[in-house]
UniProtKB/Swiss-Prot annotation:
It is found in: Cytoplasm. It comes from the Bacteria. Keywords: Cell cycle, Cell division, Cytoplasm, Septation. Interacts directly with FtsZ. One of its GO terms (biological process) is division septum assembly. GO terms for cellular component: cytoplasm. Contributes to the efficiency of the cell division process by stabilizing the polymeric form of the cell division protein FtsZ. Acts by promoting interactions between FtsZ protofilaments and suppressing the GTPase activity of FtsZ. It comes from Pantoea ananatis (strain LMG 20103). Its main location: cytoplasm. InterPro entries: ZapC (IPR009809), ZapC_C (IPR048372), ZapC_N (IPR048373). This is Cell division protein ZapC. The keyword Cell cycle applies.
Length: 180
């Protein structure tokens, strides 16, 4: 799916679906992963897609381009990242699920990072949505992950302490752009 930010896009909360939505202005609607209980009060007032949203969109889109996700999955991840950055309530870190590293990482917004599950040693890929001195708000940047018996899916949010994060190693596969 190829989408491009537009000043006609608008944010709104859909009570029927209990989700934050983004009207993409060309007959397409994006339904986020986030329900009312996860959203800040300003999510319930309709608002336009601003220049800051567009800049953040391009940051996330550029960083996700090299991921092994399909184009539809990348679009879903990027749009959920925008919702999380703008409207998600603060989360408490859930770092006990992941192994600590000696050198805490200071990730940048939009950076792909990896975590190692403490119970299995499995690696998971996350997208940093918001960075802080000690922890980062991240979204799951892979189709699924089981964390302590609970399933997470692409775009689910989790806050992780920086000492659990490590740089994500890109897969060494050749990817070709597709001409349309």
């Amino acid at each position: 799916m190829k989408i491009k930010p537009d000043d006609k896009w608008r944010w709104f909360y859909d009570a029927e679906h209990d989700r934050m939505m983004l009207d993409l202005a060309d007959g397409m609607l994006f339904r986020s992963r986030y329900a009312r209980k996860m959203l800040t009060p300003d999510a319930f007032t309709e608002s336009g897609f601003c220049v800051d949203d567009a800049a953040l969109y391009f940051t996330f889109e550029e960083k996700c381009r090299q991921s092994p996700l399909s184009s539809d999955q990348r679009a879903e991840l990027v749009l959920n990242a925008l919702v999380a950055a703008r409207f998600l309530k603060p989360l408490m870190p859930k770092s006990w699920h992941f192994s600590a590293h000696r050198q805490p990482m200071q990730p940048a917004v939009g950076e792909m990072v990896a975590v190692t599950l403490a119970d299995s040693g499995e690696q998971a890929r996350l997208l940093v949505v918001e960075n802080g001195d000690n922890a980062a708000l991240c979204l799951l940047a892979q189709p699924a992950l089981t964390l302590a018996g609970k399933g997470m899916v692409l775009g689910d949010a989790i806050k992780v302490m920086n000492d659990r994060l490590q740089p994500h190693q890109q897969e060494k596969t050749t990817r070709y752009a597709r001409a349309v």
